[in-house]
Regions:
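Thiamine diphosphate
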Residues: 1-129, 133, 137-158, 163-210
Length: 210
């Protein structure tokens, strides 16, 4: 498996800004970013906003940004990718790190996942191709990740377009860094939800999402 600290070391060399929407497949990488990435890190509200922030950062620093997301968030990212970052518009280099939920294996079999990830998983690579974005697929077996990531950054800068790194399940190893110790909050997630539920008036309509 890939060491997140090694991965972030490469990010530090080529980028000074990371933003995105957290994904469970990327959690071992993301848990190390705050303690080891030297640039700015912003957790965004949605993938489209992330692309916008990445564009703004590049225009001010001339260094390509990194945007992370789950493949389900590609739909939200499409508009700014093709209406702003595209080579026919402002031609903005950046590296997308995309967690591949519902991934399809090399033997064409699909890994079992939640129902909402089935079609998305099957269509992820075709969607990236249709956006005319160069990409690499990595897994826990990927060798020489330094070269893979360096090549992707340099290509993005050369062609002045976004490039993507598609991440399979179990790619990054879990570390127990002192810099990334869990923060102690007064309320757990479950207790917070319980408080919200008990405060909602009866017969209220509640809309929620993942």
């Amino acid at each position: 498996m890939i060491d997140p600290k090694l991965f972030i070391k490469i990010l530090n060399k080529y980028s000074n800004f990371i933003t995105g929407v957290p994904d469970s497949l990327l959690k071992n990488l993301l848990s190390e970013i705050d303690g080891n990435f030297r640039g700015k890190h912003i957790i965004s509200t949605n993938e489209g906003s992330s692309i916008g922030l990445a564009i703004g950062s590049y225009l001010s620093s001339r260094k390509p940004s990194v945007v992370y997301m789950q493949n389900a968030g590609l739909g939200n990212a499409i508009n700014p990718l093709i209406s702003l970052a595209d080579k026919n518009v402002y031609s903005i280099p950046m590296v997308l790190i995309i967690g591949w939920r519902g991934e399809v294996l090399s033997n064409a079999k699909q890994i079992k996942d939640e129902p909402q990830h089935v079609s998305q998983g099957k269509n992820t690579i075709n969607l990236i191709k249709n956006l005319n974005i160069s990409y690499k697929i990595i897994s826990g077996k990927t060798k020489n990740i330094e070269y893979v990531l360096k090549t992707l950054f340099l290509k993005s800068l050369k062609i002045n377009k976004p490039c993507a790194l598609v991440v399979r399940k179990n790619t990054f190893k879990k570390l127990f860094s002192k810099k990334t110790q869990k923060k102690k909050f007064v309320l757990s997630r479950e207790k917070a939800i319980e408080k919200i539920i008990t405060s909602i008036p009866k017969n209220s309509i509640v809309v929620s999402t993942t």
